[in-house]
From Swiss-Prot:
It comes from Vanderwaltozyma polyspora (strain ATCC 22028 / DSM 70294 / BCRC 21397 / CBS 2163 / NBRC 10782 / NRRL Y-8283 / UCD 57-17) (Kluyveromyces polysporus). One of its GO terms (biological process) is endocytosis. This is Actin cytoskeleton-regulatory complex protein SLA1. It is found in: Cell membrane; Endosome membrane; Cytoplasm, Cytoskeleton, Actin patch. Residues 179-190, 652-661, 751-770 have a biased composition (Polar residues). Disulfide bonds: none annotated. GO terms for molecular function: actin binding; cargo adaptor activity; identical protein binding; ubiquitin binding. Keywords: Actin-binding, Cell membrane, Cytoplasm, Cytoskeleton, Endocytosis, Endosome, Membrane, Repeat, SH3 domain. The keyword Repeat applies. It is a peripheral membrane protein. One of its GO terms (cellular component) is actin cortical patch. The gene is SLA1. It comes from the Eukaryota.
Length: 1202
């Protein structure tokens, strides 16, 4: 259902007297929105053609309008149910008929539905005109339409004057409201309320009486609760109407920026100089276009200028859009932009033109200067609030505020969570959270601007009713007339609802201090400060400083006050002035009064000019003060930065400037480029140097450690240090670097010697004296591992201090002195040291392969319980271990089970099958001297013919003795396993020569050999794959009577690493352990067998793995430990068996009937010397190599001393 009650047209022109009234012209189409039940003022909206033009709404006298004529009829051809704006559009079905009132807009036709009797708009393309028969019935439809609207017809019937009133004197009638010369307040002042219902036939009717009490715009639409939102809810109407057409109310365009403020403060009076909330000011002007003048209105308020022409759409601009303003007498010239408009207005008199210019100058200056704005706001009674917390705006409609600020609360009713506030200094508006603002009580802001508003406190607390406000008319003047009070009371009683709302609003209103003046009665007894409102019916209406409005009889005022009223209104009040008693004086009174009036006008003008000058000076002072305050505030903000804020841009600029200055001091990128560093690394190094703020003067202190800390790579460190030495001119001559070595290495990469100081040095007689061989020997520095820098030994000569970091250095150093259980006598040490033989230089051609001078290892006794250390050796690939080629007595066990030794033939050394050799030459066992041959009772040992050995060259070992003793191992004698005619695979294996031609060889491939001795002989798994203990399958079986200790033979033997020294004598009988640098004991009191971790198979059958079960594996008991378990067992030059820790582990042979002669020590020096053996790559039956091995010349790069 639409909001239109009817369609009317204006029959007279009407000029509004108050802002809530509507300007209408004759024949204007009007939509009736509401009829008043208490007076004859109706709320209508004017029909305006065009989608972009707003349709104004307001009040008009009911006797100025009549029902519009129906111009045609149409019929619906489609159903129309989906309306876009139900407040203005009609819902209809097909074949419905309509009365058309206006079809000037082809898209939307203004019509009335005959079926539902509703008024509104229908789409033009949904209807079609009726046929001729229907069209002929159009004129009679007008009475039908009038009959359908009884209230408008009844009203119009009562409005026309009776014919009997034609005899009334025309001079007594008030002028018509549309008179052009009566645009000011006197047009309504002279209107007699007694003639509201009477009029002459040839004159337009008077507008109905209206109340003097303020009428709020909301009052006209709050009465009927069932109706939709009225034009006071401009935003709601605008939102709904703009969906279909841009038809909004008249006041939406004028006050859309401050509608709430205007509605809460506008007053209902009949004078053009009334100012709602002391802010909006309106003047009736005439727009001049060429030679034509058109009536218009100019309104200024809320920092906006509103121009409403009589014909045409109203326009408004903000103050900043006004680019120029000037006047020439009564003509006012304004020029706007966005949109551009140049106006020439005629104000009617010079005073009005000056007043308009003054107001424009004030708001223009206020928009440019916040200080003036603050002064202007101080003269208003706006609700203020204190800001409790800081709030930063995150959207365009929000307002940024700081704690401690005072803001104006513009609207706190629309939303309880968000309030519309305005900054006092800048005038910027926006919404802020309501809980961020604490409203200030009215009493705190009611006494500003001196003593002008002293009485507002009492007025604000009074809570007076409208009746008390009416009684105040006689508060300051004894004889104030109250003509028309009966009529006022009757009107106030007829619409008490609106009066209550108006009285509530009036309590908050105060007069404009700029228009307030001192009024004095004729006797000089009473004075009051008030603002002139208007003059009507011989009464002067004033607005006192306390907010009370009074009406004073004109004859009670002084002549000065009457002259002021005449100047403002333009009416003559001479009849109310004091006149002389004489006839001559009475004839001269008009001239004298005119002179007096002009004199007073001049005085008033001068006073006003002086007042404006003072106000301008005050504004300039406050502007300067505000500027100083702003500068002071900025300085304080810069000096007192809150700690929670991020660093100021000045700090960031300082950091960048310092960083830039550092960059400017020295170009590290160029430095690294000149040093030879790769370009991809120069930037990273440069960034690291700049982060650490390394400057050019710090180059002298840069060393390897600093560069390494700064992230430089090793190669780049060398380049940078060389460049620094060259740049700084430092001495780069070779010097012995005094640097600390590693934990186990020296400065040149060799292993440290941790033996005691009493170790003897290598005898000079054992060193080669051929300088050519030494000098021509190539040196390969990359043979072994990387050599870290370390501190060199002070005891070594510079010639012998160059180590290569190889495993050979272990043989060149003294072994650690173990913790001995018995102290060996010095005499015995001397005896053993004297046993060292001289090398046979005939068969040996020593070759120096390095600059390292070997120190002889100390000999240890093999008898008793003395712990004998085992020389360390490297257990990886590329192991070239020296062997003794001299005459060395080999100890052997005479009782119990003896381990199987290689004794001759084309001997394939035992290789570490199952383990990956890292390459190089595998050292061979020393088999010289008296090598015991195990008699196996006639059983031939299993040979390893056709078994492929490890793909490395194993040097041929030649045994020196002529007679090889045969060791009886209890029971049957077992012949050693031989490898005669074994085809080597992958490399050339040296052949061991034996003295007696009978060498036992261990099988290195095929099935595992079975020891069939009567004693306890272990099954040695020397084959290619990992040996398996035959505990039911192919596991070695102990055929001895005692309990045999099952050894772990599967997997890999634990590999020893650098610095490992193995003890093979003494009470300890430990197998070597795995970790690097550990000192391993292979003999001793504890028979701890190390556990291997690479593919080992644990013996789970037979006896326990503990060697101590059954028979102790103590070397004192004559039990020999077989070192030849799948790996080649090297021999040391001091007669001790070097235990190979790779491959399968050996099983100790246990026998209860052994003697403790041998002590488990192999290769002890015996009476028979060992012969030098060929160490080349040929076999034993081939020609001798020209170069022979010399263990005393062995080094890291030449382990055999070629």
């Amino acid at each position: 259902m639409t909001v239109f009650i009817g369609i009317y047209k204006a029959i007279y022109n009407y000029e509004p007297q108050t802002p809530d009234e509507l300007t209408i012209q004759e024949d204007d189409l009007l939509y009736l929105l509401e009829k008043s039940n208490v007076d004859d003022w109706w709320t209508v909206k004017k029909r305006v053609i065009g989608s972009d033009i707003d349709e104004p709404a307001g009040l008009v006298p009911s006797n100025y309008v009549e029902v519009a004529d129906v111009i045609s009829q149409v019929k619906a051809v489609y159903d129309y149910h989906e309306v876009q704006n139900p407040d203005e559009e009609l819902v209809f079905n097909e074949n419905d008929t309509f009365d058309v009132y206006d079809d000037k807009d082809p898209d939307w036709i203004l019509a009335r539905s005959i079926s539902t009797n509703q008024f509104g708009f229908i789409p033009g393309n949904y209807v079609e005109p009726l046929n001729a028969e229907t069209g002929s019935a159009v004129p009679p439809s007008q009475p039908a339409a009038a009959a359908a609207l009884p209230p408008p017809i009844a009203t119009s019937a009562t409005s026309p004057p009776a014919p009997a009133l034609t005899a009334i004197d025309i001079s007594t009638l008030p002028p018509p409201p549309q008179h052009s010369s009566k645009t000011n307040a006197q047009a309504s002042d002279s209107g007699n309320r007694d003639y509201a219902d009477k009029d002459l036939p040839d004159l337009p009717p008077n507008k109905p009486s209206r109340s003097n009490t303020e009428t709020n715009e909301d009052d006209y639409y709050d009465a009927p609760p069932t109706k939709p939102a009225r034009p006071n809810s401009t935003s709601n109407e605008q939102d709904t109407r703009q969906k279909a057409r841009s038809r909004t109310s008249y006041y939406d365009q004028h006050y859309e920026d401050d509608a709430e403020d205007y509605r809460s403060s506008q007053r209902d009076d009949d004078y053009n100089d009334s100012e709602p909330s002391g802010e909006l000011r309106t003047w009736n002007v005439a727009e001049i276009e060429g030679r034509k003048k058109r009536k218009a209105k100019l309104s200024i308020g809320n920092n906006r200028l509103f121009f409403s022409p009589q014909k045409g759409s109203p326009q408004d601009w903000s103050v900043d859009k006004l680019i120029s303003y000037d006047n020439e007498k009564k003509h006012l010239f304004l020029e706007f932009v966005d949109p551009y408009k140049s106006l020439e207005l005629h104000t009617g008199d010079n005073d009005t033109c000056k007043e308009i210019l003054s107001v424009i100058g004030e708001i223009k200056g206020a928009s440019r200067d916040p200080g003036f704005k603050e002064v202007e706001m101080a003269s208003k009674s706006k609700k203020k609030g204190n800001v409790l917390y800081d709030f930063t705006a995150e959207s365009n409609d929000e307002l940024t505020i700081k704690q401690g600020q005072v803001v104006y609360i513009i609207n706190d009713q629309k939303s309880k969570d968000w309030w519309l506030c305005e900054l006092i200094d800048s005038g910027k508006r926006g919404v802020v959270p309501s809980h961020f603002i604490e409203p200030i009580q009215e009493k705190l802001t009611s006494s500003h601007t001196g003593g002008l508003f002293k009485s507002i406190k009492k007025f604000a607390k009074g809570g007076k009713s409208s009746k008390a406000s009416d009684d105040a008319y006689s508060g300051s003047w004894e004889d104030d007339g109250m003509e028309g009070s009966t009529e006022r009371r009757s009107r106030s009683g007829s619409y008490s609802t609106r009066k209550r709302a108006s009285s509530t609003t009036s309590k908050k209103e105060l007069p404009n201090p700029k228009k307030s003046r001192i009024w004095e009665d004729r006797s000089g007894t009473f004075k009051v400060e008030a603002q002139f409102i208007g003059c009507k019916e011989g009464k002067v209406h004033l607005h006192k400083a306390n907010g009370v409005k009074i009406a004073v009889a004109a004859e009670k005022l002084s002549d000065d006050d009457l002259v002021y009223v005449e100047r403002v209104t333009g009416f003559s009040l001479d009849k109310y002035k004091v006149r002389g008693s004489g006839t001559s004086s009475s004839r001269q009174d008009p001239r004298e009064s005119e002179r007096e009036r002009r004199r007073r006008l001049r005085e008033n003008d001068e006073k006003d000019r002086d007042r404006r000058l003072r106000e301008r000076e005050l504004n300039e002072l406050q502007k300067a003060r505000q500027l100083l305050d702003n500068e002071r505030t900025k300085l304080q903000e810069q000096n007192e930065q809150p700690p929670s804020k991020p660093p100021r841009p000045s700090s960031g600029m300082g950091n960048r400037s310092r960083s830039q200055s550092t960059k400017d001091n020295y170009d590290w990128f160029e430095f690294f480029l000149n040093s030879g560093v790769d370009v991809s690394s120069c930037q990273r190094y440069t960034s690291n140097f700049e982060k650490e703020r390394i400057t050019e003067d710090m180059m002298v202190d840069i060393n390897d450690s600093i560069l390494r800390t700064l992230g430089l790579r090793e190669g780049d460190i060398v380049r940078v240090m060389k460049y620094l030495d060259k740049k700084l001119g430092r001495d780069v001559s070779p010097q012995t670097a005094v640097v600390a070595g590693g934990m186990f290495s020296e400065a040149d990469g060799s292993l440290k010697n941790n033996n005691s100081e009493n170790q003897s040095s290598v005898g000079q007689q054992l060193l080669p004296n051929n300088p050519d061989l030494v000098s021509n020997t190539p040196i390969d520095d990359d043979t072994w591992t990387v050599r870290p820098a370390a501190k060199s030994e002070a005891t070594l000569a510079p010639k012998t201090a160059e180590f290569t970091g190889s495993m050979q250095d272990l043989l060149d150093l003294k072994p650690l002195e173990p913790k001995k259980t018995e102290q060996l006598p010095i005499a015995n040490l001397a005896v053993t040291e004297s046993v060292v033989p001289e090398p046979n230089l005939k068969n040996l051609e020593p070759v120096r392969t390095g600059n390292v001078v070997q120190k002889p290892l100390a000999n240890t006794l093999t008898g008793g319980a003395t712990l004998v250390p085992l020389d360390p050796f490297k257990t990886g690939g590329n192991n070239v271990l020296p062997v003794t080629t001299g005459f060395v007595m080999m100890p052997f066990a005479t009782g119990g089970a003896m381990p199987i030794q290689r004794t001759g033939g084309i001997i394939v050394p035992q290789t570490t099958f199952g383990t990956n050799a890292a390459g190089g030459i595998m050292p061979a066992q020393i088999t010289g001297g008296l090598i015991p041959v195990a008699t196996t009772g006639g059983l031939m040992p299993q040979t390893s013919f056709g078994v492929t050995p490890v793909a490395n060259v194993v040097p041929l070992q030649r045994t020196g003795g002529a007679v090889m003793p045969i060791a009886t191992t209890g029971g049957a004698n077992i012949l050693p396993q031989t490898t005669f005619n074994l085809p080597p695979s992958g490399t050339v294996l040296p052949i061991q020569r034996t003295a007696n031609g009978l060498m036992a060889a261990n099988t290195t491939g095929g099935m595992m050999p079975l020891n069939t001795t009567g004693g306890m002989m272990p099954l040695n798994t020397t084959g290619g794959m990992i040996p398996l203990n035959t505990t039911g399958g192919m596991m070695p079986m102990n055929t001895t009577g005692g309990v045999m200790s099952l050894q772990r033979t599967g997997g890999m033997m634990p590999q020893t690493s650098f610095g490992t020294q193995q003890m093979t004598g003494g009470a300890m009988n430990m197998m070597p352990q795995i970790s690097f640098g550990a000192q391993q004991m292979t003999g001793g009191a504890m028979n701890v067998f190390p556990q291997t971790s690479f593919g080992a198979q644990q013996m789970t059958g037979g006896a326990m793995q503990n060697p101590n079960m059954g028979t102790m594996q103590n070397p004192n008991m004559g039990v020999m430990q077989n070192p030849n378990m799948g790996a080649f067992q090297p021999k040391s030059q001091f007669g001790m068996t070097l235990q190979r820790t790779g491959g399968a582990m050996a099983q100790p042979i246990m026998d209860a009937g052994v003697t403790g002669i041998a002590q488990g020590v192999q290769n002890m020096s015996m009476a028979q010397p060992l012969q030098n053996q060929p160490t080349g790559f040929g076999f034993g039956n081939g020609p001798q190599q020209p170069v022979q091995a010399n263990i005393y010349n062995a080094s890291a790069s030449n382990p055999f001393g070629f």
